[in-house]
């Protein structure tokens, strides 16, 4: 059976088209509002994080790595005579995310401390093989940090309350840390050290950026917004101005905008599934370059809609005495919508099963009482992938019936497809809101 599958819904529901319009418009309106909220929330959150980083950069060091200065005596008493290019490992018992980028060549691992509510003054000095010098200072909540880069060839690590020092040989980066007293009290066991080591700068820049999954959802929301905006405009024009809806220019314009947004939505959903799968099996955040995702998602969507400008791809079909529908050729619909939809649905289903299997093994080893495991399961397993599967399963069923049985699907399935497929942005935003709420409880 050839032709546009949507003509089936128009023919079957010619006496009840109001239900199709209402289901489609209702789902699109929910998605439109939800995607706007998601996009605005993401941008505001990113702005606040960037502003907070500019004003108080040390708070991101607090989240990055901590230094227990109670280990200082152990280092000094261990008889270490020089601080060579091999760093001294200082463990922290209070932080589970104590992971810095691996060192290269002769770069020493910096010591970064967390200090809560302490009015402390920190001073650091570092030198490199060159004769250049620089300075850095930051002030926040009564705490001041000062960074200088004089010309030195030796490094010492000292504490104001104990004359413990560690001499250093010539290395690429040489750091001096002094921990003074304040108001008769010691500064405390956790103190922050700023340095000019490139790994730390890169880590701090990454720390102030939103989570990668949030960024992926942001771009998914943009593609949803493009699609639902086209759907809403189309429905309103069909209802209030039927003359415009009969023109071929209108058909091409609204089909391009809707199809571009829907294709981009499928590809961004595939990228999210890929990211969650990699992060789950590696048990750590997966470092990605978003430029590749942009090329795949937006590029493939552009290729998909480019052929719509060729002749005989889109035609205006007359429905029931004066009504019209912008019909797409069956071959185009098969290759540029049905096949990508089936592939995306299968890929997301495979990722769902693999992640579910992985977490079943983890729960079997560590027990289901682990709060962290429960949170990860809720976040990664139950929302983003399920949102995709639930919303697009009706489209898959209807296209399967249309292609393999050669007949129009039941009208009730069309109602479900019109609502869920146009409401995909709403369910994505709902998943984003729920996971963000769980983040705040962690």
Swiss-Prot record:
Entry keyword Hydrolase: no
Disulfide bonds: none
Chain coiled-coil ranges: none
Protein name as catalogued: Cyclic AMP receptor-like protein B
Compartments, record wording: Membrane
Family: Belongs to the G-protein coupled receptor 5 family.
Residue ranges, compositional bias (Polar residues): 112-122, 145-166
Transmembrane segments: 17-37, 220-240, 256-276, 290-310, 335-355, 383-403, 411-431
Keywords carried by this UniProt record: G-protein coupled receptor, Membrane, Receptor, Transducer, Transmembrane, Transmembrane helix
Native species: Dictyostelium discoideum
Task of the protein: Receptor for cAMP.
GO biological process: adenylate cyclase-activating G protein-coupled receptor signaling pathway
């Amino acid at each position: 059976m050839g032709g546009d599958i949507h003509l089936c819904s128009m023919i079957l529901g010619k006496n009840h088209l109001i239900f199709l319009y209402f289901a489609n418009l209702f789902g699109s309106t929910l998605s439109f509002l939800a995607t706007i909220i998601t996009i605005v929330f993401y941008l505001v959150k990113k702005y606040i994080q960037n502003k907070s980083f500019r004003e108080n950069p040390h708070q991101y060091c607090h989240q990055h790595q901590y230094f227990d200065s109670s280990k200082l005596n152990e280092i000094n008493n261990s008889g270490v005579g020089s601080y060579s290019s091999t760093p001294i490992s200082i463990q922290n018992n209070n932080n589970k995310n104590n992971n810095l980028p691996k060192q290269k060549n002769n770069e020493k691992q910096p010591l970064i401390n967390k200090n809560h509510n302490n009015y402390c003054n920190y001073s650091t000095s570092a030198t490199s093989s060159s004769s250049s010098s620089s300075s850095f200072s930051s002030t926040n909540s009564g705490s001041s940090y000062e960074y200088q880069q004089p010309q030195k060839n030796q490094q010492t690590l000292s504490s104001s309350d104990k004359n413990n020092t560690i001499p250093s040989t010539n290395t690429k980066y040489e750091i001096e840390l002094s921990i003074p007293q304040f108001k008769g009290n010691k500064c405390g066991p956790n103190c922050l050290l700023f340095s000019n080591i490139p790994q730390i700068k890169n880590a701090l820049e990454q720390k102030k950026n939103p989570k990668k999954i949030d960024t992926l959802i942001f771009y998914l929301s943009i593609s949803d917004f493009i699609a639902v905006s086209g759907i809403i405009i189309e429905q309103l024009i069909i209802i209030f101005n039927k003359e415009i809806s009969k023109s071929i220019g209108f058909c091409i314009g609204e089909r391009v905008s809707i199809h571009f947004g829907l294709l981009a939505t499928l590809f961004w959903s595939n990228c999210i599934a890929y990211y969650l799968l990699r992060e789950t099996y590696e048990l750590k955040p997966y470092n990605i370059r978003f430029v590749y995702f942009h090329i795949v998602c937006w590029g493939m969507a552009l290729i998909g809609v480019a052929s719509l400008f060729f002749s005989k791809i889109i035609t205006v079909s007359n429905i029931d005495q004066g009504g019209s529908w912008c019909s797409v050729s069956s071959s185009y619909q098969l290759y540029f919508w049905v096949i990508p939809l089936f592939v995306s649905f299968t890929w997301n289903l495979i990722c769902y099963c693999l992640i579910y299997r992985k977490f079943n093994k983890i729960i079997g080893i560590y027990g289901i009482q682990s709060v962290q495991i429960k949170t990860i399961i809720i976040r990664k397993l139950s929302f983003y992938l399920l949102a995709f599967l639930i919303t697009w399963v009706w489209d898959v069923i209807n296209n399967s019936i249309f292609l393999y049985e050669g007949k129009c699907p039941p009208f009730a399935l069309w109602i479900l497809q019109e609502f869920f497929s146009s409401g995909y942005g709403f369910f994505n935003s709902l998943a984003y809101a729920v996971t963000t709420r769980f983040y705040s409880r962690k």
